Amino acid sequence: MPSIEGEYILKFRDDQGIFSTGETSIILDAPDLIDSQQIFVDREDTDPTAFGGAKSNVTISGGALQLSNPAANLTGTYTFADILDLGAVFSLNVKRLIQAVGFTVGAANTIDGLIPAGTFWDDYAQNGNFDGPEINDVSALIAVRSTVSPPSNGSSYTDSDFSGKTFNTFANGTFKGRGFQFRLTLTSESTAHNISIQQLGVTANFESRTERSYVSGGSTSTAPLTSSSSASGLNVTFGKPFFVGTSNLGGANAFLPSVGITIIGAAAGDYFVLSNISATGFNIKILDSSNNPVNPAKQFTFQAVGYGKGV
């Protein structure tokens, strides 16, 4: 089962394709162990143009997405209208959202239509299937493909930017890239059955992380740094950049990291001033009680807490 909260109704199926007569219920309450920041929510069904992406053998009916004609094609695809651009390469946590129901092609879809003429309520659906026979042979899967390259046109991604990239089916998972494209695949195993997608979307988030390393020469280090005696201070570059938001995702610099400093051997009156905190680093000045750069210079360590880990 995917690690997504909710109740799962499970039936077993043998190698002949025959389902078990009964089912069982499992409730999954996923632990919330690590703080995270949601940066992207896409609902294709509630977009200004619902299900406005590219369609192959699927159509919109009654506000929902379904196979155009199972008798002609048992599989169809829908490519999400929105392509996610993080602005740089990160490892991203993605989770799907699907609300769907299977139905019999051409069957009545109201209680009045389903109840045979002359049948009393007490005689109807004694097996518990009030909306008709169970439909266990339809499915809907969301897949994602990604690219680490920037948009070829310099502004926004198109399908051609993902040429040669493979779609990977997921329920939730972590994927590396800058651009992410999503696709839904609908499948029926019977020409008599179809599937209706009522809600469709994905959410994406970054986990909180702590950075203590910095770039020094061509490598990274966690050793204490030495402050600068210059009035311009010392620029520190994080070992790995954070995600801080874009104009389309939360807002530019909406998620700047929080930086803590420990001065080693600080004298009375010594203090620090931080500036230019960004996705990639910060500037620090360590000053004495007269507001001058400390002399001799002092060593210090830092701890930055933010979201996402750049590649």
Task: Cite the ranges covered by each PLM segment.
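Short, solvent-exposed secondary-structure boundary motifs
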Residues: 42-51, 259-269
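Hydrophobic beta-strand segments within extracellular beta-sandwich modules
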Residues: 8-10, 180, 302
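Beta-strand signatures of extracellular beta-sandwich domains
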Residues: 141-145, 260, 301-303
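Extracellular receptor-binding modules and their adjoining Ser/Thr/Gly/Asp/Asn-rich linkers
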Residues: 201-256, 263-311
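Beta-strand-rich ligand- or partner-binding modules
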Residues: 4, 14-222, 236
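Hydrophobic beta-strand positions in extracellular immunoglobulin-like domains
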Residues: 12, 96-98, 288, 306
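A generic structural motif
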Residues: 13, 145-147, 262-264, 307
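Surface-exposed coil/turn segments at beta-strand junctions on protein surfaces, enriched
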Residues: 1-5, 85-87, 173-177, 229, ...
